[in-house]
Amino acid sequence: MSPSFKSTAILGAVALAARVRAHGYVSGIVVDGAYHGGYIVDKYPYMPNPPDVVGWSTTATDLGFVAPDAFGDPDIICHRDGAPGAIHAKVNAGATIELQWNTWPESHHGPVIDYLANCNGDCSSVDKTSLKFFKISEAGLNDGSNAPGQWASDDLIANNNSWTVTIPKSIAPGNYVLRHEIIALHSAGNQNGAQNYPQCFNLEITSNGSDNPEGVLGTELYKADDPGILFNIYQPMDSYPIPGPALYTGGSSPSPNPPTSTQSPVPQPTQSPPSGSNPGNGNGDDDNDNGNETPSPSLPVEIPDDLTSRELLLVAQEIIARLLELQNQLVVSN
């Protein structure tokens, strides 16, 4: 390993540690041109009276993930301690929904998957453990010829951190939970290394359809040893087995949207947490990490001294992922 490679890797690792909390969340959704707010997890938990939104609340203020060893836990359903949103977004079957992430780190390559579950009543009071999800959209590996590959998550980033999903025309009308998820695979070559980021939203769907797909309980969607969960992206890949149940016949595997230069307004936090709280501002990195450029942080770089043990683990995983990518770049260049 050359000295320049070593120094680049070390500086990149330090920069990652300094920005360990940079993962994103869905700040809102757009339906027929109307914006509906999501749960702003780095703001609303610290407000005495947060607004009613369609997005489910969560206690994942560190913007962390659900690991494979928690796939049987209710946290996998709609993220950590997920609780239903208070209101519903109205949408016609056959229409598209744009989900707007506030950010997503380029190093966190992986699939984007969408599910629906019929609440059989008001979603604002539904028991999440009773929800049965059917997959309506999935997208995974686009090109695996050069590790770590081009993924659906890269399409999301290229489209201004947004993703579009179509509500199947054939499903019956009713209130549904939309479960949108990115699975980050940068550490998935190791047991318990995949990172699931589920986000949930309440929908009121109007439809002339009649299908009521059976679905799968959220705690049964994945297993820790599924081929698409335990998966090494740091090697040439011919294909990728997208995890979860089979795609609903009325669903789709979307083609990526072309990148756009504009997007609907995304609400930004305007209030800092109370003194003494430690919400963090993400767990990932925001470097250009597409295999063409390497990190070039300015010095000195301070590593936060208030990281939790979970965040320290994330730092280690991020460092390993970055080193593997840099090593792959060196091999390719030689």
UniProtKB/Swiss-Prot annotation:
Full protein name: AA9 family lytic polysaccharide monooxygenase A
Protein encoded by which gene: LPMO9A
Keywords linked to the UniProt accession: Carbohydrate metabolism, Cellulose degradation, Copper, Disulfide bond, Glycoprotein, Metal-binding, Monooxygenase, Oxidoreductase, Polysaccharide degradation, Secreted, Signal
Biotechnology: Lignocellulose is the most abundant polymeric composite on Earth and is a recalcitrant but promising renewable substrate for industrial biotechnology applications. Together with cellobiose dehydrogenases (CDHs) an enzymatic system capable of oxidative cellulose cleavage is formed, which increases the efficiency of cellulases and put LPMOs at focus of biofuel research.
Residues annotated as signal peptide: 1-22
Similarity comment: family membership: Belongs to the polysaccharide monooxygenase AA9 family.
Subcellular location: Secreted
GO MF term list: metal ion binding; monooxygenase activity
Biological role: Lytic polysaccharide monooxygenase (LPMO) that depolymerizes crystalline and amorphous polysaccharides via the oxidation of scissile alpha- or beta-(1-4)-glycosidic bonds, yielding C1 or C4 oxidation products. Catalysis by LPMOs requires the reduction of the active-site copper from Cu(II) to Cu(I) by a reducing agent and H(2)O(2) or O(2) as a cosubstrate. Active on hemicelluloses, including xylan, glucomannan, and xyloglucan. Shows clear activity on cellooligosaccharides, generating C4 oxidation products.
Disulfide bonds: C78-C200, C119-C123
EC numbers: 1.14.99.56
Glycosylation sites: N160, N208
Cofactor note: Binds 1 copper ion per subunit.
Region (Disordered): 244-304
